[in-house]
Amino acid sequence: TAEPTPTPEPTPLQFTTVDASYFDDALFIGDSRTVGIAEYGSLKNATYFADVGLNVYVAQTKAIAVKNVGTVTLPQLLSQKTFGKVYIMLGINELGNDLDDITAKFSSLIDTVRAAQPDAIIFVEANLHVGPSRSSTDATFNNPRIDKLNEKLAALADGKTIFYIDINELFD
């Protein structure tokens, strides 16, 4: 009898340095944190679908002013422009809700992006931790709960066309 061929270990992807033009075809979807990146960050060539208080429950229906595009819903934006990369950072505003429900809505959002932008790489961004004093005194907005949500969001990544990015270790 033939021995089964062992499945090779996948080669981990390596981070690389890129110049700003890498973000020419990037879309950032997010809440106030993403608004801050759009207004104060250096990636002025990217497209931002971001608004203070944006969450997964309204992200597909809310009309938002997008620079050089106009006021559009996310499905309208996705049908008007082609994106090679889509970064999504949502979840902190929803933290008072059921984590499985948040994850299901996030998954639906990914499905909407994938249907409209089949060739885009999607990056699910971890929710950033809150400060230690907030975490230790708030029953909802605390780092253990944020970590639980982030674990669920990480599970949405397939490592092929959907990737999970967690930069909390850089800030903790």
How should each PLM-predicted stretch be described?
Residues 1-24:
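N-terminal, intrinsically disordered, polar/charged segments of Gram-positive cell-envelope systems
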Residues 16-108:
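Conserved SGNH/GDSL esterase-like catalytic core that processes O-acyl groups on lipids
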Residues 78, 113-114, 154-157:
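N-terminal cationic-hydrophobic initiation segments that often serve targeting/anchoring roles
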Residues 89, 125-126:
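Alpha/beta-hydrolase-fold catalytic nucleophile elbow
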Residues 95-99, 131-139, 172:
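Extracytoplasmic/secreted cell-surface and envelope-processing proteins
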Residues 106-111, 150:
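Generic structural signal for well-ordered alpha-helices
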Residues 117-121:
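A short helix->loop->beta-strand "cap" motif at the edges of active sites that frequently abuts
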Residues 131-167:
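Substrate-gating cap/lid alpha-helix
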